[in-house]
Every structure is written in structure tokens, then in C-alpha cells.
Regions:
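HIT superfamily nucleotide-processing domains
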Residues: 1-128
Length: 128
């Protein structure tokens, strides 16, 4: 099922998808993801070896979204305090800096729906 931006707008930082079945990858993309699914320690080193507190990357294995929407991941250093990466104003500020004047939807999956749970991260969807 291809998810439209309008569908994605049902979710936000206060209301992430309750189930991983509400938004998912294509079967092919999911299989590629499972083959790649990184060692979380290696991923941490890859993302944060430069000492940054956060980084934004285009999703390597995006959800099944329409072509006019891009899927990014906002990764936070796992060494940050819980309070900071859960500060909604801080998250909004980061999103506004990087995607100024763009139509965005963003959320962090519930813990039970995270496949990478040792590195705090938000899904960001940007409509072109």
C-alpha cells in the first residue's frame, strides 16, 4: 500500500502510529532492510564518530510512500539525555532549521514498534 502525505498527516510527534502495521515498507524494501539491518553499535559509530549530537539522513529503507514525499531519519546520539531528544520544542527547532518552509510530518515510533531501539530517532516526511 502506498501511503500518501495526507495519510501520514494522521501522525505527529504527539500521536505516532500505534502499530507497525499502520505504516510499513514494501515487501521488497523490508527484505532488503532485514538483510542490511545494521549492528547498532556500528551504526552509532558511523552516525556519530564526528561528535555531533544529531544527524539527518535520507532513509535508506523508506516506508512505502508516494513519490512526491521524501523520508528522512533524524538520528540522535544515544549519549544525549532522554529529556533533550524528547523535548518537542527542540525537535521542532531542528526540523524548522533543516526543512524551513516545507510541509513536514514527523514522529518517533513507540518503543514496541522500533526495529532500532538503541539509537533515538524520528521519522520525517517532507512533501515536495
Amino acid at each position: 500500500m502506498v501511503y500518501t502525505f495526507e495519510y501520514l498527516q494522521h501522525f505527529n510527534i504527539n500521536k505516532p502510529p500505534k502499530s507497525s502495521k499502520l505504516i510499513s515498507r514494501t515487501k521488497d524494501m523490508h527484505e532488503k532492510y532485514l538483510k542490511y539491518k545494521p549492528n547498532q553499535l556500528n551504526l552509532m559509530l558511523e552516525l556519530f564518530s564526528n561528535g555531533n549530537l544529531y544527524t539527518i539522513k535520507l532513509a535508506l529503507f523508506p516506508y512505502d510512500i508516494e513519490n512526491n514525499v521524501q523520508h528522512y531519519i533524524l538520528w540522535f546520539s544515544p549519549f544525549l539525555k532522554y529529556k533533550l531528544y524528547n523535548d518537542k520544542n527542540y525537535i521542532k527547532k531542528i526540523i524548522n532549521i533543516h526543512f524551513k518552509n516545507k510541509n513536514t510530518v514527523y514522529f518517533m515510533n513507540y518503543h514496541k514498534n522500533r526495529s532500532i531501539n538503541k539509537i533515538p530517532h524520528y521519522h520525517i516526511f517532507v512533501k515536495n
